[in-house]
Amino acid sequence: MSLYALLLIALGMSMDAFAVALAKGAAVRMPPRKIAATALVFGTVEALTPLAGWVGGFYAKPFISEWDHWAAFVLLGGLGLKMMHEGLSGEAEDARENKRESWWLTVLTAFGTSIDSMIVGVGLAFMEVNIAFAAAIIGMATTVLVAVGLTVGRALGVLFGRRAEFAGGLVLIAIGTWTLLSHLGLIG
């Protein structure tokens, strides 16, 4: 898998966390140190969950290698549709917590936004990809986008939260479609 495709996946997987960070930033004025710590928690969790999904998918690979491109297409496409639906319906995470939010709640929120990354990890097991590198890219993208989201959220509120979720879904659908079409020989 190309670096460009990995960056698109990382961007798509970071959109849930970015949307939550925008909302959280609008609701809770965090000092820069807490913004950095919160972003690192989200990034670490987002990097670990695709690794867990990849391990599960890797061990299932011999059983489904004949239709692996369909599995990646269905997983990424379904996840993308789910994210788009949440973005349109307003069901995205609402992080309007009180100012004394605990670290456990931050970790739980990070896990909640990274469940999708575990599914992506399963899909990545069926592609030619260095999973450690992919997980690191996903984690770094999430860390940066959460820090940006928390900072920008203070000024812009939740204006872009739903749009970010929708855009992340579009990216995942595009990657899933590209994977399917390239395995079928319809694109280079």
Swiss-Prot record:
Keywords attached to this entry: Cell inner membrane, Cell membrane, Ion transport, Manganese, Membrane, Transmembrane, Transmembrane helix, Transport
Top-level taxon of origin: Bacteria
InterPro entries the UniProt entry points to: Mntp/YtaF, Put_MntP
GO molecular function (one): manganese ion transmembrane transporter activity
Location(s) in or outside the cell: Cell inner membrane
Single GO cellular component term: plasma membrane
Bilayer-spanning residue ranges: 3-23, 35-55, 70-90, 104-126, 140-160, 167-187
Membrane disposition: Multi-pass membrane protein
HAMAP family (alphabetical): MntP_pump
Family (UniProt): Belongs to the MntP (TC 9.B.29) family.
Function: Probably functions as a manganese efflux pump.
Protein name: Putative manganese efflux pump MntP
